[in-house]
Curated annotation (Swiss-Prot):
It comes from Bos taurus (Bovine). The chain crosses the membrane at residues 21-41, 63-83, 95-115, 163-183. The keyword Transmembrane helix applies. InterPro entries: Beta-casein-like (IPR020977). This is Keratinocyte-associated protein 3. Belongs to the TMEM54 family. The gene is KRTCAP3.
Length: 240
């Protein structure tokens, strides 16, 4: 029963759902990529330095977030192509490979961002500005005090709020990327007839639906041609 719920790709609504998932991946990927870029521009570029004052979890989480956004956009494009070309095995395998990689990367991104948020909340953002304020590693020293405060090129009281305001949406975006990538994996496995999502007669059903849709598309094209011809004739008469 659980397997049936997970393997939700069918011949009737599966291609349209795959197309919507592809569009959603492109949108979510762009948003996550934008959040990662804004985070780097507003927070990490101030506190990152060669001396390693910024702990690796912050930089790693941000890099993975940007990479996950780029890969999600690529996966969305492949999903759109696969939804319109249901009988091309190469697209199915490409969809499966990209979906698996993006699923793992998005899951790692979510965990990394959760770790970054947890550490930042636990120490009150002091590790973000440890190089500018060496004395602030002591939790008894307020953020707006301590040695080096006058030499900081940024406002230390805003770095904490800005980082959290950008990290928390990134966590949800990464979780959404992982969920959508999981659906793409299911769709690719179903189309290839591999694993527990295999459905007998799916290819035949898709072929029948394609054959039924082809005359309808042809009829719509003919109607459009007739409308265009009428418009041309009307314009010619009005010109005469």
């Amino acid at each position: 029963m659980r397997c049936r719920r997970l393997c939700a790709f069918d011949a009737a609504r599966g291609p349209r759902r795959l197309m919507r998932v592809g569009l959603a991946l492109i949108l979510v990927g762009h948003v996550n990529l934008l959040l990662g870029a804004v985070l780097h521009g507003t927070v990490l570029r101030h506190v990152a330095n060669p001396r390693g004052a910024v702990t690796p979890e912050y930089t790693t989480a941000n890099v993975i977030s940007v990479g996950s956004g780029l890969l999600s956009v690529s996966l969305g494009l492949v999903a759109l192509l696969a939804s319109r070309n249901l009988f091309r095995p190469r697209l199915h395998w490409a969809l499966l490979a990209l979906a698996l990689v993006n699923l793992l990367l998005s899951a790692a991104c979510s965990l990394g961002l959760l770790l970054a948020v947890s550490l930042t909340v636990a120490n009150g953002g002091r590790r973000l500005i440890a190089d500018c304020h060496p004395g602030l590693l002591d939790p008894l020293v307020p953020l707006d005090q301590g040695s080096g405060h006058a030499d900081c090129p940024f406002d230390p009281t805003k770095i904490y709020d800005t980082a959290l305001a950008l990290w928390i949406p990134s966590v949800f975006m990464s979780a959404a990327e992982a969920a959508l990538s999981g659906y793409c994996c299911v769709a690719a496995l179903t189309l290839r007839g591999v694993g527990p999502c295999r459905k007998d007669g799916l290819q035949e059903q898709l072929e029948e639906l394609t054959e039924l849709e082809f005359p309808k598309r042809k009829w719509q094209e003919n109607v459009q041609l007739l409308d265009q011809t009428r418009e041309i004739r009307t314009s010619q008469k009005s010109w005469v």
